[in-house]
Amino acid sequence: MKVGIVGSGMVGSATAYALALLGVAREVVLVDLDRKLAQAHAEDILHATPFAHPVWVRAGSYGDLEGARAVVLAAGVAQRPGETRLQLLDRNAQVFAQVVPRVLEAAPEAVLLVATNPVDVMTQVAYRLSGLPPGRVVGSGTILDTARFRALLAEYLRVAPQSVHAYVLGEHGDSEVLVWSSAQVGGVPLLEFAEARGRALSPEDRARIDEGVRRAAYRIIEGKGATYYGIGAGLARLVRAILTDEKGVYTVSAFTPEVEGVLEVSLSLPRILGAGGVEGTVYPSLSPEEREALRRSAEILKEAAFALGF
């Protein structure tokens, strides 16, 4: 099975590396305007495969994407320190206007997996440019924010993060919504579990975890210029869900006809992900405050996409 990655920067190359380590695909093709960069990353990652799985990693052109089951769109300009994801819009929308048609010319049956920030709006841009059914254009959305939320809760409660079930919805960015009301640990409501564990969550604890999730990307960007390992692993996990027709539930971004009264917006909700992309949405139980926060997040994304004409 072939996977394409358009954009061989930090996110694209980290995704290719994660795919190779996980053995998700048989072939990974890196496409980039900077052919030398794509070739260098491909060769370096290929040299890691003897220690992992037999994956053929190579650089190529758009034509080499033919037959790809999934294509990761990681092309674009990097987020600058202090820059919000929504401020990236004008620059990255222009990139997608060139990239999306060329990808679909070579791989018309592929699921498009959008990684370029601001990912929710770029998912909407890719969807409008592609003419594909909504489920075939999937954004990485809040998969990383959800992972951060679960990891911080697990750290506080001293349990494995795999036992924590909690979601971050809406924008992958400043207006994201941490869903505390329906969070569970081992099937037990979060607050009940925390009390039983002797680790009751005070308002200060919740505020600290919220800040830890919401500001993580900014701290990392300030320290080293970009985030890529976490999202690379997350994207590889989404690719595996597509290639294996897993039908797992992930907080990914997709075009949504209506959410909390806001029409035609791309944002993250728990989605069932399989071979055809998004196959359904699992709308979680939300408190009134969370519903209002999700509505505001949807409005922000809707306005940003509308300003671009998408």
Curated annotation (Swiss-Prot):
The EC number(s) this enzyme carries:
1.1.1.27
Task: Kindly identify the residues recorded as the active site.
Answer: 172
Q: Name the UniProt key words of this record, in alphabetical order.
A: Allosteric enzyme, Cytoplasm, NAD, Oxidoreductase, Phosphoprotein
Q: Which domain of life is it from?
A: Bacteria
Q: Indicate which residues the UniProt annotation says bind substrate.
A: 79, 85, 117-120, 145-148, 227
| SUPFAM superfamilies membership | LDH C-terminal domain-like (SSF56327), NAD(P)-binding Rossmann-fold domains (SSF51735)
Asked if the Swiss-Prot or TrEMBL record annotates the protein with the keyword Phosphoprotein, the reply is: yes
Its biological purpose is as follows:
Catalyzes the conversion of lactate to pyruvate.
Q: What is the recorded name of this protein?
A: L-lactate dehydrogenase
- Gene symbol here is ldh
